[in-house]
Structures are given as structure tokens and as C-alpha cells.
């Protein structure tokens, strides 16, 4: 189970399958039985998302694949307070997302939400600085992080070939 907590106090829970959970990293699988859209991408029915949640990193990664196994996109979420445990992954969402298309083009989403959270006093100056540092890191190193995720999926026997 993925538990996504928000700075305003709410939370969302997502059902998933744990492929591997260690004190360092949890890898989860989210099947998508129905079609959906996000980040300007279409995810056909039968698509799947692999989630990578690191205990000591301020981001998580979703690797999104179509029903044919082809890469649709990568999405990184800036997060804090990641907790990995048996049957659950929990974290605090810090609003900013970085999307990367299969060509490697990267862009950020929800910067306006970050500004609004800061102006409402829900985001401390320290966390704002953390978001900015993590954004720079993700824009500079998304290819390396995606390759690391691909290696992990191959180790788990979930993929053959390139993860993107």
C-alpha cells in the first residue's frame, strides 16, 4: 500500500503489489486496468507503473509503461519523511513533480502549488530550499536515476531491455 500524505493534512492511499521491500528501497507495481491521463500522457488500459521509494532520498520515481511494455514516461515526485515497512510505503508529498518523456525531455509541474503552499505557511523555508535543490538534482540526473531503476527492475525479473 502507498500512503501519500499532503502538507495540508490530507492523505491518499493506493493499492499496489510490493515487488521488493528493503530498509533502503521499496519497489511497487501499480497495474492500470482502465485508461487514464496524467501529465499530458495517455495510459491505455493494461498499462502499469513501477514505483521506486528510497528511504534516504527526497524524491520517488514512477516508471510508466504501456501494455506492450514500451516506456510512456518517468515521473519524479519531490518528497520528505519516507517510511518503508512491511505492506506499506508512506511519505509526505512536497508538491513538485518532474516529468520526463521517452526522448529524455524533462519539465516540472505544480510549481504554482509550491508557491501557494509557501505563501500559506504550510511549507517552511527549509522545505522550500529542499524542493529547489531536489528539482535541480532531478533535472540534471534523471537519466542516471532512471537507469538505476531499470537495473533494479531487471534484477527483479520485471523487465527485459531498456527502461528508458
What residue spans do the PLM features occupy?
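Phosphate/ribose-recognition catalytic cores of enzymes acting on nucleotide-derived substrates
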Residues: 42-83, 89-96
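Charge-rich, low-complexity N-terminal segments
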Residues: 1-48
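A short, polar/proline- and glycine-enriched secondary-structure boundary/capping micro-motif
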Residues: 37-42, 86-87, 117-121
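Hydrophobic residues embedded in beta-strands of well-ordered beta-sheets
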Residues: 25-26, 71, 106
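Short acidic-glycine loop/turn motifs at beta-strand connectors
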Residues: 21-23, 67-68, 101-103
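A hydrophobic, small-residue-rich beta->alpha segment in the mid-to-C-terminal subdomain
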Residues: 94-139
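Cysteine/selenocysteine-centered motifs that mediate thiol-based redox chemistry or coordinate metal-sulfur cofactors
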Residues: 134-164
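A long amphipathic alpha-helix within ATP-dependent nucleotide-binding catalytic cores
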Residues: 76-79, 83, 90, 130-146
Amino acid at each position: 500500500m502507498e500512503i501519500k500524505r499532503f502538507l495540508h493534512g490530507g492523505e491518499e492511499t493506493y493499492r499496489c503489489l510490493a515487488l521488493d521491500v528493503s530498509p533502503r528501497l521499496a519497489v511497487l507495481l501499480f497495474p492500470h486496468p482502465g485508461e487514464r491521463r496524467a501529465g499530458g500522457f495517455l495510459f491505455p488500459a493494461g498499462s502499469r507503473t513501477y514505483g521506486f521509494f528510497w528511504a534516504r532520498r527526497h524524491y520517488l520515481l514512477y516508471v510508466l509503461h504501456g501494455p506492450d511494455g514500451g516506456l510512456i514516461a518517468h515521473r519524479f515526485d519531490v518528497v520528505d519523511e519516507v517510511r518503508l515497512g512491511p505492506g506499506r510505503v508512506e511519505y509526505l508529498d512536497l508538491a513538485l513533480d518532474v516529468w520526463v518523456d521517452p526522448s529524455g525531455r524533462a519539465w516540472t509541474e505544480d510549481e504554482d502549488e509550491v508557491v501557494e503552499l509557501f505563501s500559506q505557511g504550510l511549507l517552511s523555508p527549509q522545505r522550500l530550499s529542499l524542493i529547489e535543490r531536489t528539482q535541480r538534482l532531478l533535472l540534471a540526473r534523471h537519466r542516471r536515476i532512471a537507469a538505476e531503476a531499470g537495473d533494479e527492475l531487471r534484477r527483479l525479473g520485471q523487465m527485459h531491455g531498456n527502461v528508458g
